[in-house]
């Protein structure tokens, strides 16, 4: 695909194909993630048992791994599912929630990246930096006050990790090691909704299920998500984060390809 305007049409493909997205995600965001994927037009499944995750991953259009509330049992299930997805050619999307906050969390994120071929890694700057051994402060599972060139960081991480890297924040950055995209859509109220980033990772999974160009899938998903947030804020943002969350779920359903093309703000470098 030639440019992001064409990639925006992936939204229609997601809604037409209704891809199955297998999520091994955290307990905080499971319901929100499932509802968000349904609103988008994808079909979510949450399967965690090591005894079935390999089989389920092979049935899915994409596998999403999220270490937000990790434990040894779940990590082993992620590795089984990830390796099964690799065998079946199913793209694996990874959210290294809180990498850098604790040694266990950081080591787990790196272990998954080493043992599973990842298509896209989506995180904040601190999480991505800590995955490649660079210093960047982190507060709990949120990026701290670290300073640095996020564009350069995304490029380095993509090269070192062998995956498309999406660093999200006030401005989103997507890098595949050769080309970098800056996305300027979104709204500050997303930071007031628990699991907004986790749902975004699963939305990337839905787009990756219908488009094997991982960079295209990531850019299209981020622009769509950001435009939906802007539309939700315009309708309900003044009433606060609760009203925004409801409006955002609606916006995920009604935001169109034309909306994305009209309101998307993407710079290619």
Swiss-Prot record:
EC numbers for this chain: 2.7.1.50
Reaction(s) this enzyme catalyzes, per UniProt: 5-(2-hydroxyethyl)-4-methylthiazole + ATP = 4-methyl-5-(2-phosphooxyethyl)-thiazole + ADP + H(+)
GO MF assignments: ATP binding; hydroxyethylthiazole kinase activity; magnesium ion binding
Domain of life: Bacteria
Alphabetized CDD domains for the sequence: THZ_kinase
Keywords tagged on the record: ATP-binding, Kinase, Magnesium, Metal-binding, Nucleotide-binding, Thiamine biosynthesis, Transferase
One GO BP: thiamine diphosphate biosynthetic process
Cofactor names: Mg(2+)
Sites where the protein binds ATP: 122, 168
InterPro entries in alphabetical order: Hyethyz_kinase (IPR000417), Ribokinase-like (IPR029056)
Recorded metabolic or biological pathway in which this protein acts: Cofactor biosynthesis; thiamine diphosphate biosynthesis; 4-methyl-5-(2-phosphoethyl)-thiazole from 5-(2-hydroxyethyl)-4-methylthiazole: step 1/1
Family: Belongs to the Thz kinase family.
Biological role: Catalyzes the phosphorylation of the hydroxyl group of 4-methyl-5-beta-hydroxyethylthiazole (THZ).
Protein name, as recorded: Hydroxyethylthiazole kinase
Source organism (scientific name): Geobacillus kaustophilus (strain HTA426)
Gene behind the chain: thiM
């Amino acid at each position: 695909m030639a440019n992001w305007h064409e990639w925006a049409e992936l939204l229609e493909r997601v809604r037409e194909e209704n891809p199955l997205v297998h999520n091994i995600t955290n307990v905080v965001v499971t319901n929100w993630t499932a509802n968000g994927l349904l609103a988008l037009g994808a079909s979510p499944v949450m399967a965690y048992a090591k005894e079935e995750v390999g089989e389920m991953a092979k049935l899915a259009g994409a596998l999403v791994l999220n270490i937000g509330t990790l434990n040894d049992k779940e990590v082993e299930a992620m590795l089984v599912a990830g390796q099964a997805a690799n065998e079946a050619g199913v793209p694996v999307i990874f959210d290294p929630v809180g990498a850098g906050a604790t040694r266990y969390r950081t080591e787990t994120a790196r272990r998954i990246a080493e043992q599973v071929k990842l298509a896209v890694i989506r995180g904040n700057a601190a999480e991505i930096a800590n995955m490649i051994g660079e210093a960047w402060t982190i507060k709990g599972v949120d990026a701290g006050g670290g300073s640095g060139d996020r564009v350069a960081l995304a490029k380095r991480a993509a090269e070192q990790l062998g995956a498309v890297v999406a660093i999200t924040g006030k401005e989103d950055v997507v890098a595949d090691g050769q080309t970098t995209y800056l996305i300027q859509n979104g709204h500050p109220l997303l930071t007031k909704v628990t699991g907004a980033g986790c749902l975004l990772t699963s939305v990337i999974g839905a787009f990756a299920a219908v488009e094997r160009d991982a960079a295209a899938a990531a850019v299209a998903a981020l622009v769509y998500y950001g435009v939906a947030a802007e539309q939700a804020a315009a309708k309900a943002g003044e009433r606060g984060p609760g009203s925004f969350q409801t409006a955002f779920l609606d916006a995920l359903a009604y935001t169109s390809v034309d909306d994305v093309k009209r309101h998307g703000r993407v710079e290619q470098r």
